Regions:
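Domain-level signal for soluble alpha/beta catalytic cores
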Residues: 1-188
Length: 188
């Protein structure tokens, strides 16, 4: 239930009152994420970053599209939104692109190092390729970059060296007025 989720997140927010930032990540359900964001907005004044995890079909496990996530989370007043886990940075480009069409907020990407081999459990994207793929997403307004499953400090170091001479490119385009459910966006 929404109220129960809200109370759960409220308790966490209050317990972590000394945190610098609130991060909700690896979310699949937009309704739950709404409860979390509202609990944070109503119980602290910290910046809020949110990421959802998307499948190969471009939707979360519960069917949320990147556009619906972007519209809803922008409307809720988060400070940044994006994607983490599930896939490699190359496979997440369509997700990041779709989000960028519906928000001017800074985007977050914390991709996996690809997908693990079912036999060896080794991830298939090495640090150089990972950093290259992640950096190709900067054009969509990505400001927060990291790594999730299969990454390690070598990946983050490579990203750092790749972005050292690049400036954040905020999105300044006009974003159409929209309404949405958790699965469909309608432009007005």
């Amino acid at each position: 239930k929404f109220d129960e989720a809200y109370e759960y997140y409220k308790q966490q927010i209050l317990a972590g009152k000394d945190a610098d930032v609130i991060v909700f990540e690896t979310m699949t359900d937009l309704y739950e994420l709404k409860a979390a964001v509202l609990a944070a907005k109503e119980n602290c004044d910290k910046p809020i970053l949110t990421t959802m995890t998307f499948e190969r079909n471009g939707r979360t496990f519960t069917g949320v599209s990147p556009a619906c996530a972007a519209v809803t989370l922008t409307g809720l007043g988060v400070d940044a939104l994006g994607v983490n886990c599930s896939l490699g940075p190359d496979e997440l480009e369509p997700v990041v692109f779709e989000m960028s069409k519906y928000t001017n907020l800074p985007l977050v990407i914390k991709a996996n190092a690809g997908l693990p081999d079912p036999n060896s459990n080794e991830y298939n994207i090495m640090p150089d390729k990972f950093a290259e793929c992640v950096c190709s997403l900067l054009k969509y307004g990505v400001k927060v970059i990291g790594g999730c499953c299969g990454t390690n400090p070598d990946y983050i170091a490579k990203i750092k060296s790749e972005v050292a001479d690049k400036e954040y490119q905020p999105q300044t385009k006009s974003v159409d007025t929209t309404v949405c459910s958790s699965t469909t966006v309608v432009e007005i």
